[in-house]
């Protein structure tokens, strides 16, 4: 039987980003250790292997699926998403990062800014992450003079992508020493936690709108049924509520029979919570990532829409050349990515990098959609544009 979840502190979702092997997962472990001590054991210490949990990850020592870790600071309760650092798994980072309230950029004090450091900051900008804080890790192995240069380089990088590089807090840590019990290193982790409390604003949660949760993952729990996980985008869900599963296939109705967060039971889940929702009478194969769970009748699946789109320039990491009628990139919406064909409107022959354009899009599969839905457009492993649904056609 799961224990009840204590909601006496506001909940906030943050993530770690940064180059592979710069210590993102070790930092997550160190934070759980310090938080467990701070909270009198209310937070479970997660060791590296528990966070880096998929078998192929452990073999390669690389985080693939975004892992969620819980911690409590002096002011808030957090879900920490350990965003993947390997270039093949950028797709997961997009869905992980786009659902966070802020990010910790982890940079090794030995290596400094690396190609993926740049790529992740660019992605954070593209998916609209509101704030970033910096952790310079591995300071026990680094040259102090080099650390000053790395700080300058990180500030320049953040400024380049429109984050406030001059004022962003940069905290120096040694996650590994903190894990091994070094008291000074633990103070560095505590300083990082305090900075997150103070610098990342508590987001306003949309509680008064109809319930909606994009599905990130699906599990089958023996004897209990099917659980879908994700971050609640808006509204509230209570045990016993009727919900619909919308998008990608025919809409299905079911009942929520349980809500859990970090293996603790909730009487209700609300906007901003990372939860698992138990569904009555739904088989594991009846539901998939990319669908949404929603209050019945509040959202419908669509394939065709018009959108206002901004196409990234080459300097922003986008295309070097224009695209034409019938261009077929991928559209990333919430937790799904679907191929769509673009029709250019008002007699346009092409769309150039840097253009703002109104386009008509026809997706190969229907997704849960309402007016104003944001999406990223990607092709060949890079983001080439961003847009919003302005009109639903069918």
From Swiss-Prot:
PROSITE patterns: G_TR_1, G_TR_2
Keyword set includes Metal-binding: yes
Keywords: Cytoplasm, Elongation factor, GTP-binding, Hydrolase, Magnesium, Metal-binding, Nucleotide-binding, Protein biosynthesis
Subcellular location: Cytoplasm
Keyword GTP-binding assigned: yes
Binding site for GTP: 18-25, 82-86, 137-140
Classification via InterPro entries: EF-Tu_GTP-bd (IPR041709), EF-Tu_GTPase (IPR050055), EFTu-like_2 (IPR004161), EFTU_2 (IPR033720), G_TR_CS (IPR031157), P-loop_NTPase (IPR027417), Small_GTP-bd (IPR005225), T_Tr_GTP-bd_dom (IPR000795)
This protein's name: Elongation factor Tu 2
Source organism phylogeny: Bacteria, Pseudomonadati, Pseudomonadota, Alphaproteobacteria, Rickettsiales
Gene that encodes the chain: tuf2
């Amino acid at each position: 039987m799961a224990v009840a979840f204590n909601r006496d502190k506001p909940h906030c979702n943050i993530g770690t980003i940064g180059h592979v092997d710069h210590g993102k997962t070790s930092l997550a472990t160190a934070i759980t250790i310090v938080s467990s001590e701070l909270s009198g054991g209310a937070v479970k210490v997660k060791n590296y292997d528990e966070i880096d949990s998929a078998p192929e990850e452990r073999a390669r020592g690389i985080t693939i699926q975004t892992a969620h870790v819980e911690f409590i600071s002096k002011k808030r309760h957090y879900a920490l998403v350990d965003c993947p650092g390997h270039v093949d798994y950028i797709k997961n980072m997009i869905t992980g990062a786009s659902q966070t309230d802020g990010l910790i950029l982890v940079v090794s004090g030995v290596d400094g800014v690396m190609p993926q450091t740049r790529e992740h900051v660019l992605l954070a900008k593209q998916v609209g992450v509101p704030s970033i804080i910096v952790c310079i890790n591995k300071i026990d192995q680094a040259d102090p003079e080099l650390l000053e240069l790395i700080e300058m380089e990180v500030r320049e990088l953040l400024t380049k992508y429109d984050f406030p590089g001059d004022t962003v807090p940069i905290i120096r840590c040694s996650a590994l020493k903190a894990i091994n019990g070094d008291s000074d290193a633990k103070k560095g982790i505590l300083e990082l936690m305090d900075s997150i409390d103070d610098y990342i604003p508590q987001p306003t949660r949309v509680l008064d709108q109809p319930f909606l949760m994009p599905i990130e993952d699906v599990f089958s729990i023996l004897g209990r049924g099917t659980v879908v996980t994700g971050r609640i985008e808006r509204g509230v869900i209570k045990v016993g509520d009727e919900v619909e599963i919308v998008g990608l296939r025919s809409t299905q109705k079911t009942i929520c029979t349980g809500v859990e967060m970090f293996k603790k039971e909730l009487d209700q889940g609300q906007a901003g919570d990372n939860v698992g929702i138990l569904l009555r009478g739904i088989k594991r194969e009846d539901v998939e990532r990319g669908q949404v769970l929603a209050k019945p009748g509040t959202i419908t699946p669509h394939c065709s829409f018009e959108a206002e789109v901004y196409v990234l320039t080459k300097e922003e990491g986008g295309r070097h050349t224009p695209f034409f009628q019938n261009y077929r990139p991928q559209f990333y919406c919430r937790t799904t990515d679907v191929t769509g064909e673009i029709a250019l409107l008002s007699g346009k022959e092409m769309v150039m990098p840097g253009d703002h354009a109104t386009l008509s899009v026809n997706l190969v599969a229907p997704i849960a959609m309402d007016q104003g839905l944001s999406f990223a457009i990607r092709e060949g492993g890079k983001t080439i544009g961003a847009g919003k649904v302005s009109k639903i056609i069918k």
